[in-house]
Amino acid sequence: MERYRRIDQTRPSGTRICETRPNGGKVQRNLKRNGENMNLQISNALTLLHHHLGDNLLAVHLFGSAVSGGLKPASDIDLLVTVRTPLSDSIRKALMTDLLRLSAWPATAHLRPLEVTLLVHDAVRPWRYRPMRELQFGEWLRDELQAGRFEPAMADHDLAILLSKARQHAISLLGPPAAELFEPVPEADMIHALHDTAAQWNGPDDWLGDECNVVLALARIWLTLSSGEIAAKDVAADWLLERLPPEHRPLLETARDVYLGQARDDLAQRPQALAAFIGYARRQIERLRSESANR
């Protein structure tokens, strides 16, 4: 599941965030490669959103692997949904419950896992950190949702990363382009969000069952702090493999290959190597953050 929510910046001096519009030809090729099943799944999700949200629905954007790099075997379909006003408890519960039948993990021939992030437009414009997230649906919540437990709206640092991704590479399925709908995320807030994401992983209980995603998320955070680029997981892994000490490379190589569907995920069976890589990556990320703060 996609848990690092993905700033094109120039460094080291005069750093700024640059928004880019997606390359239409590349986007269309990615969508064609992703297939008709994905398009049908997205269409069904849009129908469901219209049904539950009605006139409150302001915009829907497709972003992530589906429009940038292509979906991999375990990739989510990422949807960013924007509404005008907060949801009632009844609509929140009904929408989350109905999304369960439009999503699957593991992926099937007809359904991929959905990740739906819903926000109230006024909660993120004008921009402030940490922004409020109105709702989030993902397969990691399936057991909780089926048990009748629904998350309320909450502050979420991850929205800084997510909105930066969407402003750069997203397809508007409804409403204006993301670069018009949302303000740029200041560099300081982006760096803060990346650091806060890495700081979540302190011990084995924090990455249990999600080892591959955590390793690749750290590679992406490291790349972004070093170069200002937002890259796909496999691209970030390739970049970092050229810079890692030899003892940490096998673990990252495996995580990349698992993501690409080319290897079996055995990272949980390598606890010492896993903890060593995560500790090393977090120290380097903290160093890069300190260097940014001192410039």
Give the residues covered by each predicted segment.
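Catalytic metal-binding acidic patch
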Residues: 60-101, 113-121
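Structured mid-to-C-terminal alpha-helical surface segments
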Residues: 229-295
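Helical scaffold of the NTase/Pol beta-like nucleotidyltransferase catalytic core
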Residues: 29-60, 90-96, 100, 295
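Conserved NTP/Mg2+-binding pocket subregion across the NTase superfamily
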Residues: 34, 97-208, 215, 290
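Extended, basic/helix-rich recognition subdomains
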Residues: 195-254
